[in-house]
UniProtKB/Swiss-Prot annotation:
The enzyme's E.C. designation: 6.1.1.7
Catalytic reaction(s) noted: tRNA(Ala) + L-alanine + ATP = L-alanyl-tRNA(Ala) + AMP + diphosphate
Gene: alaS
Alphabetic keyword roster: Aminoacyl-tRNA synthetase, ATP-binding, Cytoplasm, Ligase, Metal-binding, Nucleotide-binding, Protein biosynthesis, RNA-binding, tRNA-binding, Zinc
Gene Ontology MF, one: tRNA binding
Intrachain disulfide bonds: none
SUPFAM superfamilies: Class II aaRS and biotin synthetases (SSF55681), Putative anticodon-binding domain of alanyl-tRNA synthetase (AlaRS) (SSF101353), ThrRS/AlaRS common domain (SSF55186), Translation proteins (SSF50447)
Group of enzyme by EC: ligase
Keyword tRNA-binding: yes
Cofactor binding notes: Binds 1 zinc ion per subunit.
Function in brief: Catalyzes the attachment of alanine to tRNA(Ala) in a two-step reaction: alanine is first activated by ATP to form Ala-AMP and then transferred to the acceptor end of tRNA(Ala). Also edits incorrectly charged Ser-tRNA(Ala) and Gly-tRNA(Ala) via its editing domain.
Residues where Zn(2+) binds: H572, H576, C673, H677
Annotated protein name in UniProt: Alanine--tRNA ligase
Pfam (any one): tRNA_SAD
Length: 884
């Protein structure tokens, strides 16, 4: 491997950040691969995602110049490159995007000249190798390139609209049909005439000669619903440059998989799979997917059968599938992680910190996949054998996915190898039907939302509930029902009430919404059954009107159910202490995956790979209760996000935080949290874990109770202990020893019983041999044996077979009115003519039973009654008919 060392991938990354730092930019870290501000987006797929709210005006930032290296993923939804990865020069699931941004500060002049300076002066790219494009009407950018930078006119290409549609151009960027938009200018690298392809905008533009390096977007307009463009008061700059394709150019190689970073990963993949040909495309797949999987897991995504977890599982299994194609039958993929850490860990310390967790997650998925592949292949083969037209039915592909965890793309791959295909339309129809069936109807209020137009007219609800649980002067600003907005509601109606201020906490962060009462001075009374957050900023009181009526503009008083809120606060604070204890016991790979903070209990889901032992459970419980007894003051403080992180505060995966955050500290626990809490940890009183289980691969769940609920749980357990002691004639202090003595005695009696059964069977065998009937030199035994269970029955059958060289045997064990049947065919004279499974069916049908098995052995059952005797008496005749 001969990779130029002057511009390694690592150096390119650091050069970029250093360059823009010197230009006055604040260097910000990569946002997580799971967007915190856009629920419609599966993954962060570009550098602008974390700044979307800034461009939309929903978020204000103190800094006006920013640069970063953003981790991106394109493997699901609209931006899905998965099927192309490994087989093309520049497709990846995971990639890094270099970007610099201006929020109303510098504009085209600086963006263009700095880009040229970095490319030609710092990275020493020959200017004659570069070509730029501009939007057809963007004369300003054209002039800057020609007059200020000095690019010849024959190296500047104006790009118009596609198919004549206004602003539908590769060189005009828009977030949506309306909103921020503007022209962009792109910088291309010319690989030379020996590479096929023409310049951008030409018929041959899809060739590989001209490769886009950098896209500079100038957001200067606000597109209206009628298509007109209104200049923005503060234009912005958004640029993006793919690190991998830039590295390929600077390292003088043609494909991204030839750069230093990928070559290191490919060589490791070749070592793990024992493949000598490092050009094998499967190695590219494994190398690429190792990055995507590791960074997804680092950012809190775990393999599952839905959503982002399903995409991760697909990527993992695609890599494992390619390993399987290379002949690998043992786990290998997890061993890519140390090499990945070696080449990317310095740039991403969180990858280094989570390496062990990533490896364990991948190993668990590899072991799971081996089982899935074994079972799934058997089912696939059964389905394929029945297919006459070469099309695997969509319903069967869905059954493989839904029941056996067999990814549909894997089914499609295997089908393709056999000259078949999957009915994907049928698969999607089955998937859609399942979603409809599984979608819970939900209680009133959860599906109701404000329109964007109405929301724009309202100010966010002011939450008073941190300091007070009762408040007056709450003005009704909107009323919603299942039918949408309404101006008024009357007695008996269920309606969501939005007020300008409220003491009611809206469900968020796992904490349930408050309940209570809304009232007016004229006797109006509304029962608040829940409080939900609408559009992330409005508190919706889910109510039933029990007296009077309410209309928009009314002024109400609100009272939160105080006792319930306090119980919720106990459990929320206990959740923080539990989270801290879990990380202390198991390590920093523990991360919250979900929670429920209710008045009667708390539920906490977290990343961990194995069941918790009794000793570990006791330790965790003790650690939490130690913090409770320490009676720490719960301190709550507002501070900047970076200051909070520097102070050791835990930010929860999937939560969206602003520049200023609320930090909750109690003892050694420090978390960012918007929930309600107690004053001191001692208020919790007692913390008690009541259950622990797994909820999905790599995710465990603990349920616990606090305060009076914990005391009641302990008292109930104590009551059960005394009840058990009474049943066994012991006292509570000696229950364990007494039960141990009873179980030892039981084992002794069971051994004695087995000996007696053995003697009974020996005597029974002697009796059965004496009843054997000779039919054409084949011994036929058909007998009823009262009191023998299935195990004893099979033992008797095996002993008879040892003593009868040619025999047909039917034994019926009768216990409690039920019949257990076993049949056997033994020896050359009977085998081939008499089949045990056919004989069993003949007998079983006569006693309202059924069964099955092989030609030499079968078992089944039925009901006791007069017909059993006649069925057994007829066995010899049946055998004779089949032997003749």
């Amino acid at each position: 491997m001969n990779i130029p060392t002057k511009f390694t991938t690592s150096k390119i990354r650091s050069d970029f950040l250093e360059f823009f730092k010197n230009k006055g930019h604040k260097i910000v870290p990569s946002a997580p691969l799971v967007p915190g501000n856009d629920p419609t987006l599966l993954f962060t797929n570009s550098g602008m995602v974390q700044f979307k709210d800034v461009f939309l005006g929903a978020e204000k930032r103190s800094e006006v110049r920013v640069a970063d290296v953003q981790c991106c993923l394109r493997a699901g939804g609209k931006h899905n490159d998965l099927d192309s990865v490994g087989y093309t020069a520049r497709h990846h699931t995971f990639f890094e995007m270099l970007g610099n941004w201006s929020f109303g500060d510098y504009f085209k002049k600086e963006a263009i000249t700095w880009a040229w300076e970095l490319l030609t002066h710092v990275w020493e790219l020959p200017p004659e190798r570069l070509l730029v494009t501009v939007y057809r009407t963007d004369d300003e950018s054209y002039a800057l390139w020609r007059d200020m930078v000095g690019v010849p006119e024959d190296r500047i290409v104006r790009i118009g609209d596609n198919k004549g549609a206004p602003f539908a151009s590769d060189n005009f960027w828009q977030m949506a049909d309306t909103g921020p938009c503007g022209p962009c200018t792109e910088i291309f690298y010319d690989h030379g005439e020996h590479i096929p392809g023409g310049p951008p905008g030409s018929p041959g533009e899809d060739g590989d000669r001209f490769i886009e390096i950098w896209n500079l977007v100038f957001m200067q307009f606000d597109r209206q619903s009628d298509g007109t463009l209104v200049p923005l008061p503060t234009p912005c700059v958004d640029t993006g440059m793919g690190l991998e394709r830039l590295a390929a150019i600077l390292q003088h190689v043609h494909t991204n998989y030839e750069i230093d970073l990928f070559q290191t990963l490919i060589l490791k993949a070749a070592e793990l799979t024992a493949v000598a040909d490092v050009q094998n495309k499967s190695l590219c797949v494994i190398a690429d997917h190792s990055r995507a999987c590791a960074f997804l897991i680092v950012d809190g995504v775990l393999p599952s059968n839905e959503g982002r977890g399903y995409v991760l599982r697909r990527i993992i299994r695609r890599a494992l599938r390619h390993g399987w194609m290379l002949g690998v039958r043992q786990p290998f993929f997890n061993n890519m992680v140390p090499t990945l850490v070696a080449v990317m860990g310095d740039a991403y310390p969180k990858l280094q910190a989570a390496a062990e967790s990533v490896m364990r997650t991948l190993l668990a998925e590899e072991e799971r996949f081996a089982e899935t592949l074994d079972v799934g292949m058997k089912i696939f083969n059964e389905v394929a054998a029945k297919v006459a037209n070469g099309v695997i039915p969509g319903s069967d592909a869905f059954r493989l996915y839904d029941t056996y965890g067999f990814p549909v793309d894997l089914t499609a791959d295997i089908a393709r190898e056999r000259g078949m295909r999957v009915d994907m339309a049928g698969f999607e129809a089955a998937m859609t039907q399942q979603r409809k069936t599984a979608r819970a109807a939900g209680k009133f209020g959860r599906g109701v939302q404000l329109s964007a137009e109405r929301a724009a007219m309202l100010s966010p609800t002011v939450f008073l509930g941190y300091e007070q649980l009762q408040a007056d002067g709450l003005r009704v600003v909107a009323l919603l029902s299942d039918g949408g907005l309404t101006d008024s509601a009357s007695v008996g109606d269920e309606v969501i009430v939005l007020t300008d201020r409220t003491p009611f906490y809206a469900e968020s962060g796992g904490q349930v919404g408050d309940i209570g009462t809304l009232m007016a001075s004229d006797g109006v009374r509304l029962e608040v059954t829940d409080t939900q957050k609408l559009m992330g900023q409005f508190h919706g009181h889910v109510t039933r009107i029990v007296q009077g009526g309410v209309k928009v503009g009314d002024v109400l008083s609100g009272s939160v159910a105080v006792a319930r809120r306090k119980m919720v606060a106990l459990n929320h604070s206990a959740t923080h202490l539990l989270h801290c204890a879990l990380r202390s016991v198991f390590g920093t790979h523990v991360a919250q995956k979900g929670s429920l903070v209710a008045p009667d209990r708390l539920r906490f889901d977290f990343s961990h790979f194995e069941p918790i032992s009794a000793a570990q459970m006791t330790l965790i419980e003790r650690m939490v209760n130690d913090e409770v007894r320490a009676n720490h003051l719960v301190m709550i403080e507002q501070m900047g996000m970076q200051a909070a992180l520097d102070a050791g505060a835990m930010a929860l995966f999937g939560e969206k935080y602003g520049e200023h955050v609320r930090v909750v500290k109690m003892g050694t626990s420090v978390e960012l949290c918007g929930g309600t809490h107690i004053t001191r940890t001692g208020d919790i009183g007692l913390f008690k874990i009541i259950s622990e289980c797994g909820v999905s691969s790599g995710v465990r769940r603990i349920e616990a109770v606090t305060g009076e609920s914990a005391l009641n749980h302990v008292l109930a357990e104590e009551h059960r202990l005394y009840e058990v002691a009474g049943l066994i004639g012991s006292n509570a202090n000696d229950v364990v020893n007494h039960i141990r003595q009873l179980t030892d005695r039981q084992k002794t009696l069971e051994r004695e019983l087995e000996k007696l059964k053995g003697k009974l069977i020996s005597g029974t065998i002697t009796d059965l041999l004496s009843t054997a009937v000779n039919v054409a030199d084949v011994k036929v035994v058909a007998a009823r044996l009262d009191g023998l269970d299935g195990k004893a029955l099979r033992e008797a059958l095996d002993r008879l077979k040892l003593q009868l060289s040619d025999a047909v045997i039917v034994l019926a064990g009768v216990t409690g009115g039920k019949v257990a049947l076993v049949t056997a065919v033994n020896g050359p004279r009977a085998m081939g003519k008499v089949k045990a499974d056919t004989l069993l069916s003949h007998v079983a049908t006569q006693i309202n039973g059924r069964g099955g098995g092989r030609v030499d052995f079968a078992q089944g059952g039925g009901e006791d009654g007069p017909s059993l005797r006649s069925a057994l008496d007829g066995v010899a005749t049946w055998v004779k008919q089949h032997l003749d």
